[in-house]
Each structure stands twice: as C-alpha cells, then as structure tokens.
Amino acid sequence: MNDFFSVEPNYYLVLAAVLFTIGAAGVLVRRNAIVLFMCVELMLNAANLTLVTFSRINGDLNGQIIAFFVMVVAAAEVVVGLAIIMAIFRTRRSASVDDANLLKY
C-alpha cells in the first residue's frame, strides 16, 4: 500500500487518544491562558488525527476535508484568543485565566 499504513491504524488512534488525554489534563489543571490554548490545540490536533485515520481507512476524503476546516477554525481561534490574552496581560500584567474574570467589573 502506502507509507501511511506501514503502521497499523490502531497505533494512530492510540496516539490520538494519548494526545487528547494530555490536552484535556492540561486544560483541567493549568491556569495560564497561553498553556490552555496550547492544550486546546493539542486536543484539536488529536481529533484531526482521528478524522484523517478513519478517512484513510474508509477510503474517502470527508474526514480529511473536515480536518482541514477544523485547522482553519483553530487558526482563527488562536488569533482572537491571543488578542484577548494580550489585552488582559496589558491591563492585569498576568496571563492567568482567573484575572479574566475580573474584566467584567
């Protein structure tokens, strides 16, 4: 076949599960907004890996197309999120998500 299936698809799915678990643990444990964004991106990449793996197993392109759109939306999310984090950092001198709650007062 090709190089993608030189490794069994199960290994890609296990890797995606491990990446998603690391990202979810980071979102639950960390309080720094930049680290939270990196963990969310890790979770999105794990979902993309799962979509691409199932797409290649089934032989269609639907999963790859959805993964591409997820990457586009994630890029837009990062742009908006980093702008908000920079605004919070300029006013509070901290990137903690606890300080974001203080913006409403």
Swiss-Prot record:
| Ranges in coiled-coil conformation | none
Q: Which GO terms describe its molecular function?
A: NADH:ubiquinone reductase (non-electrogenic) activity; quinone binding
Q: Which UniProt keywords apply?
A: Cell membrane, Membrane, NAD, Quinone, Translocase, Transmembrane, Transmembrane helix, Transport
Q: Which GO terms describe its biological process?
A: ATP synthesis coupled electron transport
- Source domain of life: Bacteria
Question: Per its UniProt record, what Pfam families does this chain match?
Answer: Oxidored_q2
Record-listed E.C. numbers: 7.1.1.-
Q: Does the keyword Membrane apply?
A: yes
Membrane-spanning residues: 9-29, 34-54, 65-85
* Chief localisation class: membrane
Q: Where in the cell is it found?
A: Cell membrane
Subunit and interaction comment: NDH-1 is composed of 14 different subunits. Subunits NuoA, H, J, K, L, M, N constitute the membrane sector of the complex.
What is the recorded name of this protein?
NADH-quinone oxidoreductase subunit K
The species this protein was found in: Salinispora arenicola (strain CNS-205)
